[in-house]
């Protein structure tokens, strides 16, 4: 932590969102990070200190949320064609993931775990994500932690609508896993977040090489833009009672369907901090 404090810098994207004489803040995060990113930058720290609550996508400190997440990971898995399951097992073994984990839980979770294993090879870990840094700071100062969504809301957007869609998701994920360009795309995304490069993030769909199939495009739209109206509702509701520091994945911030645009349309004054 001492090393992180020595390298403390503002990373990501931060807006002040104001209405009714009250200021809240909207922070675009990256869900995985590096140990040296755990210390908050000065403007992030100062903005968080001005608020009365931290709002994450889900409140992982809530015991009911913890139970729901545990139940979700232990849910039934889908049956995949033999050759596809064999390919998934091979990728799983190559990433040194526990073989028994493939025997339970939604197939979509397995896809997410495979992507996270790729990120870890590039030094990015959920433990060091922006949410972790904000959560630790808020717990130390006894700042209330709230959730913008329920676990079920996230599951509804993450899980495939059918066995056929789940199979397509696995095939797309394995193709991405084999693609030698994938590490460069993740590095570009990471660099854009670190620098707060909103313009590059706005062009993500054009350069990520991750929206090449109908399944990928539909899943992305559902997972990102599709959740924004509900989170905007939650931020608006919380802001009516308390100044809130809302921390949400950075891709939820871009374009006309992004959270800054949605809140501006609801009468908030939006000011970029960094």
Predicted regions and their residues:
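A cross-kingdom marker for long, charged
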Residues: 218-274
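Structured, acidic catalytic/metal-binding patches in enzyme active sites
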Residues: 2-6, 11-219
